[in-house]
Swiss-Prot record:
It is found in: Cytoplasm. It comes from the Bacteria. The active site is at Y129. Belongs to the oligoribonuclease family. It is an enzyme of class 3 (hydrolase). It comes from Aeromonas salmonicida (strain A449). SUPFAM superfamilies: Ribonuclease H-like (SSF53098). Keywords: Cytoplasm, Exonuclease, Hydrolase, Nuclease. Its main location: cytoplasm. 3'-to-5' exoribonuclease specific for small oligoribonucleotides. The gene is orn. This is Oligoribonuclease. GO terms for molecular function: 3'-5'-RNA exonuclease activity; nucleic acid binding. Its EC number is 3.1.15.-.
Length: 181
């Protein structure tokens, strides 16, 4: 294990909805890659306990998706609160990157950052202010090379660790097909 400012930290969170003012985090997962997108380590995958009141705020899509994946049951059984989830995630990340060096990496990662600012500010503060957002590249490909879109498909499991693995694979695909690296 080598701490390096070149390593990239990938995070995905599942939430009860899209509004950090009204919704809460259900799950957080982390993966660290090197600069070439080789996975160095998978961090903790943490379901965060939320009250029945918070879970009741979910719309039908979230209820169906997170119940089908088993996440709702894991959240109800979890002993983790947001503070403990942040502490364990930071303990893992600090083994791989110095503070404020890694951009926050993922798909639509700006949404995760919004939830971090509201609910996990200590974790958000650990990251560089920049993002590596795979969805930005996808939106550009949709406009400039739409023929590539069908060549990469995701499962859409909406399980945090699976979503990160798919985001890394998607960026590898774009690196080889769009950037030709």
């Amino acid at each position: 294990m080598t701490v390096s400012a070149q390593n990239l930290v990938w995070i995905d969170m599942e939430m009860t909805g899209l509004d950090p003012e009204e919704n809460v985090v259900l799950e957080i997962a982390t993966i660290v890659t090197d600069k070439d997108l080789n996975v160095l380590a998978e961090g903790p995958v943490i379901a965060i306990h939320q009250s029945d009141e918070e879970l009741a705020k979910m719309d039908d899509w979230n209820v169906n998706t997170h119940t089908r994946s088993g996440l709702v049951a894991r959240v109800k059984e979890s002993q983790y609160d947001e503070t403990r989830a942040v502490a364990e995630t930071l303990d893992f990340i600090r083994q791989w990157v110095p503070e404020r060096t890694s951009p926050l990496c993922g798909n639509s990662i700006g949404q995760d950052r919004r939830f971090m600012v509201k609910h996990m500010s200590e974790l958000e503060a650990f990251f560089h202010y920049r993002n590596v957002d795979v969805s930005t590249i996808k939106e550009l490909v949709r406009r400039w090379q739409p023929e590539l879109l069908d060549q990469f498909t995701k499962s859409g499991s909406h399980m945090a660790l699976d979503d990160i693995r798919e985001s890394i694979a998607e960026l590898r695909f774009y690196r080889s097909h769009v950037f030709k690296i």
